[in-house]
């Protein structure tokens, strides 16, 4: 799969399948009788390719769209400074997320959760005709003033859902992501790659994952199938 690699195409595709099955590098190396460094090299290449693909997606979110922030830690991402939560007193990394009710997800590491920061992402990623669901965080104040006149809020201290207004979809994604990342012991290194991988994996069948990754690899200049 790597150009000039001595690994057979069959073995390379088996590595890809193990990756899509979410089998870790150690177990994959054992199952396929390969050096773990070889498997790690492939896994890192896959994650880099996936992250690039997800970040380059330009289609705006439309319809009913949920927005929310979550915090990952305890370590901060190297090179990023500034507030780490809605309030104060934590070094956790804030991540902003957008969830379209068809299952599509977008995530972005942010410096803080201020209105300026969140609105900039919302304006770039969500169509103004969309119906935005959020909680009551003040970072979402003023969305109507910047063209999003269909903004509905849920008070989570009282209800998880009210008259169809909820952010259960994006919260389910946060749960999926944190549960999955826990097996990597927090993935302080390459956190953004793992985050984008979760974004890519969410809600897809194994067949979809394999087909999509094979397509990404086939269209890449460094990797080939």
Regions found by a protein language model. Name each.
Residues 1-225:
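Residue-level recognition of single "structural anchor" positions
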């Amino acid at each position: 799969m790597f150009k000039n690699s001595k690994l057979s195409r069959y073995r390379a595709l088996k590595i890809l399948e193990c990756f899509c099955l979410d089998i870790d590098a150690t177990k994959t190396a054992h199952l396929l009788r390969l050096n773990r460094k070889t498997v790690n090299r492939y896994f890192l290449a896959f994650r880099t390719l996936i992250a690039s693909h997800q970040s380059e997606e330009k289609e705006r979110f439309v319809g009913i769209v949920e927005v929310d922030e979550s915090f990952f830690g305890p370590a901060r991402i190297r090179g990023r400074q500034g507030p780490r939560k809605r309030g104060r007193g934590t070094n956790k990394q804030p991540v902003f997320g957008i969830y379209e009710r068809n299952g599509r997800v977008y995530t972005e590491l942010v410096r803080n959760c201020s209105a300026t920061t969140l609105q900039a992402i919302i304006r770039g990623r969500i169509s103004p005709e969309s119906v935005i669901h959020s909680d009551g965080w003040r970072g979402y104040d003023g969305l109507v003033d910047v063209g999003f006149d269909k903004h509905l809020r849920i008070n989570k201290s009282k209800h998880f859902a009210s008259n169809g207004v909820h952010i259960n979809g994006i919260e389910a994604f946060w749960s999926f992501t944190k549960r999955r990342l826990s097996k990597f012991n927090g993935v302080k290194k390459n956190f953004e790659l793992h985050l984008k991988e979760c974004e890519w994996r969410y809600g897809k069948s194994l067949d979809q994952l394999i087909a999509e990754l094979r397509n990404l690899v086939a269209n890449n200049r460094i990797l080939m199938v």
